[in-house]
């Protein structure tokens, strides 16, 4: 089975164009439906502390984008849900699987969030299955995203437990070092893992990690993802929560993994690292550029909406796309 499976990553794939049927790229519809809601783009800023905070979450929700709030301000989650609902905005939070999280979930019955993401590094676990069942029993209307996983077996088990979507990606992210520290993961074959998992899935797949260019979003959708979670491309903006650092007159923003010692506050079971990214412009400008690039992708696919990307052919061109090019 494994030996027969094609193994490739984003840089190994080129999508093949179809005849364009729209007069302008602006006619292409990049919206996507997840649960009972429609969002402007199939992208999610990673639920990491240097990517998203409450201010960014509120702005994304107000502007029609999906978001997932990180889980590292545990006491602030319930007030956050309340504030979002007071503004008629969707609430989307993250939980772990520790014992106290069960009481927290039960406490949300009176003001349940629209989305909960169970967010742990190795999501194919009895602890995750147990938490999915608990959330579904306590908050049956809440859309549950579970992860992270990297195999069809994991997707099926989490879906069977009640997950409404699964997040695929073990260690392909820019600040994740799981594959180096443990020898396990989808780093280097993340796109093939998305394809593999999507073929087994009956519910939405969220591709998480390894996205380095806007074209990778289109490739993720081609191989079965409904949404794409992105870290590094969303890090380093003026609004980003990461700490600003100045070196030789140039400003940088910190970006670190959720399993890094900087996140944990201790050097224990570290599977993440910290990097500095040159400060970018505003987040809204990046989202606009992503939309425009995705509209171009749809036009090359010969369609009018994201679904057309799933029907294009592709070629595997091992490590030759870049050919010395850079953006």
Swiss-Prot record:
Which residues are named in the active-site annotation?
176
Native organism: Streptococcus equi subsp. zooepidemicus (strain H70)
The record's Pfam families line, in alphabetical order, gives: IMPDH
UniProt record similarity statement: Belongs to the IMPDH/GMPR family. GuaC type 2 subfamily.
- Which residues participate in NADP(+) binding? 205-228
Q: Which Gene3D superfamilies has this protein been placed in?
A: Aldolase class I
Query: Which Gene Ontology terms describe the biological processes this protein takes part in?
Result: purine nucleotide metabolic process
Q: List the disulfide bonds.
A: none
Q: Which reaction does it catalyse?
A: IMP + NH4(+) + NADP(+) = GMP + NADPH + 2 H(+)
**Which PROSITE patterns does the annotation name?**
IMP_DH_GMP_RED (PS00487)
- Keyword NADP in the entry? The reply is yes
Return the InterPro entries for the record. Aldolase_TIM, GMP_reductase, GuaC_type_2, IMP_DH/GMP_Rdtase_CS, IMP_DH_GMPRt
Ordered alphabetically, the record's keywords are: NADP, Oxidoreductase
What is the E.C. number? 1.7.1.7
GO MF assignments: GMP reductase activity
Q: What is this protein called?
A: GMP reductase
| Gene name linked to the record | guaC
Q: What does this protein do?
A: Catalyzes the irreversible NADPH-dependent deamination of GMP to IMP. It functions in the conversion of nucleobase, nucleoside and nucleotide derivatives of G to A nucleotides, and in maintaining the intracellular balance of A and G nucleotides.
Q: What class of enzyme is it?
A: oxidoreductase
Q: Which PANTHER family match?
A: GMP REDUCTASE
SUPFAM superfamilies the UniProt entry points to? Inosine monophosphate dehydrogenase (IMPDH)
């Amino acid at each position: 089975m494994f030996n027969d499976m094609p193994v490739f990553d984003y840089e190994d794939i080129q999508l093949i164009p179809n005849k364009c049927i729209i007069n302008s790229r602006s006619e292409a519809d990049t919206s996507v439906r997840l649960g009972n809601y429609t969002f402007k783009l199939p992208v999610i800023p990673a639920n990491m502390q240097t990517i998203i905070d409450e201010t960014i979450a509120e702005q994304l929700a107000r502007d029609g984008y999906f978001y997932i709030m990180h889980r590292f301000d545990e006491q602030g989650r319930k007030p956050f849900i309340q504030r979002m609902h007071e503004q008629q905005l969707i609430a989307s939070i993250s939980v772990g699987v520790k014992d106290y999280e069960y009481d927290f979930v039960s406490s949300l019955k009176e003001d349940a969030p629209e989305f909960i993401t169970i967010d742990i590094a190795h999501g194919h676990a009895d602890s995750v299955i147990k938490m999915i069942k608990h959330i579904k029993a306590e908050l049956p209307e809440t859309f549950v995203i579970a992860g992270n996983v990297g195999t069809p077996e994991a997707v099926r088990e989490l879906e069977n437990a009640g997950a409404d979507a699964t997040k695929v990606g073990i260690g392909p992210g820019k600040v994740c070092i799981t594959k180096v520290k443990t020898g396990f993961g989808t780093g280097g074959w993340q796109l093939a893992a998305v394809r593999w998992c999507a073929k087994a899935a009956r519910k939405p797949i969220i591709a998480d990690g390894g996205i380095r260019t806007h074209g990778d979003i289109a490739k993720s959708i081609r191989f079965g993802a409904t949404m794409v979670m992105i870290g590094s491309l969303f890090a380093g903006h003026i609004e980003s929560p990461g700490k600003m650092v100045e070196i030789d007159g140039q400003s940088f923003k910190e970006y670190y993994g959720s399993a890094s010692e900087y996140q944990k506050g201790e050097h224990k079971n570290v599977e993440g690292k910290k990097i500095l990214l040159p400060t970018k412009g505003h987040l809204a400008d990046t989202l606009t550029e992503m939309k425009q690039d995705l509209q171009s992708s749809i036009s090359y696919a010969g369609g009018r909406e994201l679904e057309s990307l799933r029907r294009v052919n592709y070629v595997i061109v091992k490590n030759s796309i870049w050919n010395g090019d850079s953006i």
